[in-house]
UniProtKB/Swiss-Prot annotation:
Part of the 50S ribosomal subunit; part of the 5S rRNA/L5/L18/L25 subcomplex. Contacts the 5S and 23S rRNAs. This is Large ribosomal subunit protein uL18. The gene is rplR. Gene3D superfamilies: 3.30.420.100. This is one of the proteins that bind and probably mediate the attachment of the 5S RNA into the large ribosomal subunit, where it forms part of the central protuberance. HAMAP family: Ribosomal_uL18_B. Pfam families: Ribosomal_L18p (PF00861). InterPro entries: Ribosomal_uL18_bac-type, Ribosomal_uL18_bac/euk. The keyword Cell cycle does not apply. Residues 1-26 are annotated as: Disordered. Keywords: Ribonucleoprotein, Ribosomal protein, RNA-binding, rRNA-binding.
Length: 120
């Protein structure tokens, strides 16, 4: 029986999470993409603690965007998560794309975070 898109995404997500582990030296930059918004968190998996987060739901970000569901919004979140991470002294991360393909909004966020100074 053919897999649905949802099942394929869940399988990819489990596979990626099996390989990607955040540490205090290199925390995990986890990205979640919904139909309306995009969320990014820098997580230390050993402590189970979120160090930094940014999303298009935040009022200061939401007011400056026409939509939270496009590449422009994703790149703005990528820059914001990088700036907040660098303020906390985090320069190196491990990128966790979740079950999403590295394309479109996910790629825009990753490239913007790299340009803003995060190393991954």
């Amino acid at each position: 029986m053919k897999l649905t898109r949802r099942e394929s995404k869940q399988r990819r997500h489990r596979r990626v999470r099996g390989k990607v582990q955040g540490s205090p030296e290199r925390p995990r930059l986890a990205v979640f993409r919904s139909n309306e918004h995009i969320y990014a968190q820098v997580i230390d998996d050993t402590q189970h603690h979120t160090l930094v987060s940014a999303s298009t739901v935040e009022p200061e970000v939401k007011s400056s965007l026409a939509s939270g569901a496009n590449c422009e919004a994703s790149s703005q979140i990528g820059k914001l998560i990088a700036v907040r991470s660098l303020e906390k002294g985090i320069t190196k991360v491990v990128f966790d794309r979740g079950g999403n393909l590295y394309h479109g909004r996910i790629k825009a966020l990753a490239e913007a975070a790299r340009e803003a100074g995060l190393d991954f």
